[in-house]
Amino acid sequence: MYDEIGRLLVIGLVLSAILLFIAFYIGHTRLQKNAAFASYASRVMDFFYKPLLAVYMFFYKNPDKLHKKMADLKNNAQRKKFSKTKTRIVLAPHCMRHVECKARTTRTGIQCTSCGKCDFAELKKMSEEHGYKLYIITGSSFVKHILKHPDAKGTDGVLAIGCNYEINKGMRELKRSKIMTYGVPLLSAGCYNTHIDLEEFERQLIHLEGLNGSKS
């Protein structure tokens, strides 16, 4: 009995190693641009997230490379499907707001007044010009309130802004809701006064529109 259990464990470890190797191979080659392969690699890396995290911490002392790779794979896997969504919103982190921000907070996040002290005024303008509604959240608990709100009714696409860790985490969680996601990373991680490359953000919006042949 114990011999059989031992053999099963060995087989399981070997299969796991093979799956991880395939996922890493896809993640580090041109295959990651292929949606089907990227989707496969993303699922495998999600399943083995904790051991992968331990490996990255051991070799790199910083898991950001892992989170970036996982977020990039999810983007490549979902980009085309995201471009076909009809009702899209942008979720942005409160760490981008100015330290002196006086905007009030409701159940759907911080209500930006476009004062111009941080990136949100321009980000809000860009988002609305391309058919997105911007929501500034202080935590993941706000997402469920936003998706239930009348203003976000029928949302089938979420463009998430944040650090690579939060983007990867958010995309993984929203996948359970059958909502297509796409992530755009901040220029740097942090708890306050963070920024996004606004030109790159708009390029991404235009690119996503181009994939579907029209503006949302």
Question: Which residues does each predicted region cover?
Answer:
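Cytosol-/stroma-facing membrane-proximal "stalk/adaptor" domains immediately downstream
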Residues: 111, 120, 124-216
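N-terminal, charge-rich interaction modules
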Residues: 2-121
